[in-house]
Amino acid sequence: MNIQEKLRAWADVAYDFYSKEAYTLDLDFYTQSDLTLLTDDKPVELMVIGINPGHGRNYQEERFAKPEDLLRGNCDFKKEGNPHLNIFEWHIVRRLRSILGYGKIGDLLNDESRFVLTNATFFSTPKETGLDDLKVKEAQKVSIEYTKKLIDIIRPKHIICLGGKNCMNLLLDSTTRLLGDVVKLDYGVIDGIPVYGIEHTSSFWAREQMELVGKALERAFEQDHVPIDYGEFYNQSKDIIESFIKKRNDRDEIEHETALRWEYIYASLSNYCKYNLGLEVFEESKDSTSFYIPDEEGKSDIIISLVNQKGDKSVGVRYSI
């Protein structure tokens, strides 16, 4: 059988399981990439596995009327006029491409027939915590076997898992941290295929973290045709690890210096408004003070706001309504 015949046979049994369980759990379910694009003459270079679809709608029978629909991917993104029609513009794909770009392997995500985006389980929940429900958890454990079968059919050269306990930890019994405790880059093997676990690309990534993981993955991809030895890989990666630590420390130092400067600015402006201009305090809380300039009737006409809080360091002026 060719790969499309194998995928159709897989879809028959996967659809039977998911449609019944999704109806019982009242959960939506779907895949991501269009698997009908895969061919035997173009092997898949990279499979990217997320946790689960995050839309979180209830069960919708019309979305997948037959097993073949499961192969066509996220049908919402296929709708005419949808601005997210192009899978390459999805945030998690763009972020991953940026990460891999530091290792000059971002082009692995340029051809949907050469890479596959899927999920460890196809049940959709608004947040990952939706998988903690006992009945969903039981169904999730069974669903992983269909994901493993999909991996076995596609046989990608490399797999990247986004997230931890509900992704890579469900697929593999044991993993190794290739970069130690410096940055998350887990490694394991499933049926001879190298698997890497990184932080989910929907979360925050510092630039130096993206650079380290991207360059480390490039080196790993070059040698993972045989099992990777953790000790050897870590030693080979000391140059990029040291570069990461230096950049992280430099950034922390800059952030600390910036915080000190803002403390000075905040204190100076607060004192100037209060003592030099004689403005009255409108509102005051920790590291946030507002002063008002009264109109002819003594009402607060113009508000000057000074803020020196984490994530918000600003000076603002507004008219009181």
What is each stretch, according to the model?
Residues 1-22, 133-145, 167-261, 315-316:
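C-terminal capping/extension of enzyme domains
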Residues 2-158, 164-170, 203-204:
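A polyanion-binding, active-site-adjacent surface
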Residues 55-61, 298-321:
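Intrinsically disordered, low-complexity regulatory segments enriched in Ser/Thr/Pro
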Residues 174-184, 274-287:
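Short secondary-structure junctions
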Residues 258-279:
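Amphipathic alpha-helical segments
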Residues 283-304:
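Ser/Thr-rich, low-complexity intrinsically disordered terminal regions
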